[in-house]
Amino acid sequence: MKRIATTNAPAALGPYAQAVDTGDTVYCSGQLGLDPATGALAEGVQAQTHQALKNLKAVLQEAGLTLDNVVKTTVFVQDLGDFGTVNEIYG
């Protein structure tokens, strides 16, 4: 098992990796809309969604993968009223 880490996404806050490569599968930890350079949360749901996806892409890139390789995700939305906005960006 290999731990995946990149400075192009926020560092893990606990004793876990940004991603783990098990040989056949890469498991990514959750990503927030945090700027990896400053640690600041992006302003608003649109900017947070874009930043979270940018962070995920950076972790995947470090593992030699892209979003095309992703087969499952779980998305948490604090306000269900933002679901349409998140889904539009995410889709």
Model regions and ranges:
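Short, polar/acidic, helix-capping and beta-turn segments at strand->helix junctions
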Residues: 1-91
